[in-house]
């Protein structure tokens, strides 16, 4: 049944162009090896992000992202949408575009956190590399499917953290947002991976 629904969604997506990309045709689907690798990458990035949050909590007592929400708005930390990847409204081409765009956004946010603290730098570097690897994996799959936009996205304005506290609070907020983003991505990818 899910295969029929997915094929119907793919057929429907062939009628519309999304983000200047060629939609996937009804006979195309994502390779199982790609989906499994993506699920593995999501789990790895979530573990990296959780480690960053735990270390910020232990070292700087920044343990509750919800307490920092007002600061998120004043710092201008954007959130990435992933509405096209929900199982109810799954649009494969749009989902891949949103997933790549979100990962690209989080690459920039993690780069903006550079200098957070010497003891957290290795954790942040690992997280950054894993997000970059996942974004590259998504982009290459989009190219293989002929669904990649003609031009790769460019990084928009990123927040400027002017103090050590802002950088650390930003680290908690970015890691928390990335975790929520990846939870949605994981659900969508797991739905696609089911036979």
From Swiss-Prot:
The keyword Transmembrane helix does not apply. It comes from the Eukaryota. The keyword Zinc does not apply. Residues 1-21 form the signal peptide. O-glycosylated. Disulfide bonds join 57-63, 85-95. Its main location: secreted. Keywords: Cytokine, Disulfide bond, Glycoprotein, Growth factor, Secreted, Signal. Glycans are attached at residue 154. Gene3D superfamilies: 1.20.1250.10. Monomer. Belongs to the IL-6 superfamily. This is Granulocyte colony-stimulating factor. It comes from Bos taurus (Bovine).
